Structures are given as structure tokens and as C-alpha cells.
């Protein structure tokens, strides 16, 4: 167990929060729930899990809406996260504050969020404490909290496996790590007639295209949901 001086600043942050909400999507790596329960133990606080009652998965959304991705974001974000969050907010009317995971290197993104969503209150604990994502992972490790396995596999975030917003390098890594997901998404592209990647279908993607280490794919979080509000 870490010494209290190490643990205290981070656990007290969450003890001052009324409720921690987690929007679950079945396409996420199952290890995400392990991480969630480990956080509950560390923080001594139950995390509320909410999930779509209308759609069962990203695949369900793609196949029923006949849409994979758009310039305004992927429909799975709207159906599986945005609408689920909005339903929870309607059932819990109040003035909510959103806590963002942007790190020290993402101040510009934080500024854009505050300007675009001025009706909400926002907190950026990593930026306020001068922490990068890597340093946050290091703190978690010192606290005995194992980060989600997708990071250890070389992915830049813990999005769903087979995120429609992924680029060439991402999809070529999915092809290797999760071939069944790659094949299913490639089939869905052909059935619908649109691709995840602009200009190329997955079944035409050359295995050496792209570099996941240099590509930018945002975390599929509330940021995706709020910044496409009304689109």
C-alpha cells in the first residue's frame, strides 16, 4: 500500500465528487472493467455504470444506422455515449461539472472546450497539477493501479477495439492484434458502402500504411459527444 502522502491528494479529489459515472460500451477491451473495479477499491467509492438500452454494441449501431463515420463524428459515439449521458442528465437534473482528462500538453484543447461549451463548468485536474499522460500513468503505477491493457499493447488510448475514427496505422495494428474485429469492420464497410478511413476501404488497406505512433486519434470520451452537440 502506498504511503498516505502519495495516495491522499488523488483520492481526496474523487471523494469530493458526488458521483463518478462510467458509460460502458461492450466493444471496449474487457480489461476496462477490471480497471474500473480497481479504481473503486483504490478510491473507496462506487462507480456508477450506465449503458445504452437501445443499442448493444458499435456493430449494432453501424448495422442499424447504416453509417460508420461522418465529418461530425461516428454515430456510435452519439448512440452509445451521448444519448446515454443525456438520459442520465434528464433523470438527474442539476448543474453538472465535467472533469476532463486532458494533460499538460493539451492546453489548447482545454481552451477550445471552454469556449465552445461555455454553458458548462469544467475542471482539468491533470493540467492544473502540471501532469502529462505518462506522468499520470506513473502515478497510477505507484499507487498499485494497473492501467488499461490497451496502453500496454501500444495503443494511444483506451477507445473501443475497432474505433471507426482510427487511421491507417491504427487499423493495421488492429489487423494484427484483433483480426476478427478488422474483418468484421471491413465487411461492414462494403455492406454499407462507406469506409472508416477517408479514401480507402479496410480490405484495400496495405499492411505497411500508416504509423500508429504518429497518428492522432482522440480519446472517445465526453469531448466527442459535447463538441458535436446539435450536429
What function would you assign to each model-found segment?
Residues 1-12:
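Single conserved hydrophobic/aromatic residue that forms the stacking wall/gate
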Residues 11-231:
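Nucleotide-activated chemistry modules centered on ATP-dependent adenylation/adenylyltransferase
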